[in-house]
Design a protein with these regions (language model features):
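General small-molecule cofactor/ligand-binding pocket signal
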Residues: 24, 91, 151
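Conserved N-terminal Rossmann-fold NAD(P) cofactor-binding segment
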Residues: 1-33
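Substrate/ligand-engaging "lid" and interaction regions
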Residues: 77, 97-211
Length: 216
């Protein structure tokens, strides 16, 4: 089940039950014959998944990574190193099209996913940039990007490096975590709260820390 507040400027909402055609640890089964591939894993996992993907690439595939975090650069590098010459379009985005939280009830994780916000515009690029027209055109066929497509639309970045630097998370999360570490530790040690109820945004940030972020 997917629903939630879905905050966005234009009031775009989409809720309902989601049925997955396939769930597998065998990537070959998942990507075989696919035209559009979405990679949405943490940056620390990029190398493992991309190395697994390279031998499975097929001509005509279009790969979108949310959030890119230089995954497109890494994928092209791995293709060269592994001798892959498939004709694919590789690109990524500066952030995710929406932010979600899995609902937890009485200590149990449920199958209910709440969307907290939806993006109305995202910055994207591909490598090489000569593929940018086809890459941007493929966005129309990604339902996860509908709030962007029907919002202010996707923005074309200058290069893949531009997309990497356009991600604000490193600028926000790292200083907020380091400067708010006392709040993080005291959240459970002093105040007795459940560790997983801590929120960097709600409990770690304060006006003085936010002021320091402006100067970074």
């Amino acid at each position: 089940m997917l629903d939630g507040i879905q905050r966005n400027l234009y009031g775009f909402e989409r809720s309902g039950r989601v049925f997955l055609d396939i769930v597998s640890t065998d990537m070959r089964k998942v990507v075989k014959g696919a035209k559009l591939i979405i990679i949405g894993v943490p940056a620390l996992s990029h190398e493992y998944y991309l190395k697994t993907l390279v031998p499975l690439l097929e001509d005509g595939m279009i790969i979108h990574t949310f959030t890119d975090n230089y995954a497109s650069l890494l994928l092209r590098k791995l293709m060269r190193e592994m001798g892959c010459t498939k004709d694919v379009i590789i690109g990524g985005w500066s952030s995710a099209p929406y932010g979600t939280r899995i609902e937890k009830i009485c200590g149990f994780w449920t199958n209910h996913v709440g969307i907290k916000y939806r993006a109305i515009s995202l910055r994207g690029a591909c490598l090489p940039m000569s593929d940018i027209d086809d890459f941007m055109e493929s966005v129309k066929y990604l339902p996860c990007m509908d709030s962007v497509t029907l919002g202010e639309g996707p923005q074309r970045g200058d290069t893949m490096l531009d997309i990497g630097f356009a991600n604000v998370n490193p600028v926000i999360h790292v200083p907020a975590s380091l400067l708010g570490v006392s709040s993080m530790e005291n959240w459970s040690l002093v105040y007795g709260n459940a560790p997983d109820s801590y929120s960097m945004y709600s409990h770690g940030l304060c006006p003085s820390i936010c002021l320091s972020l402006i100067h970074i």
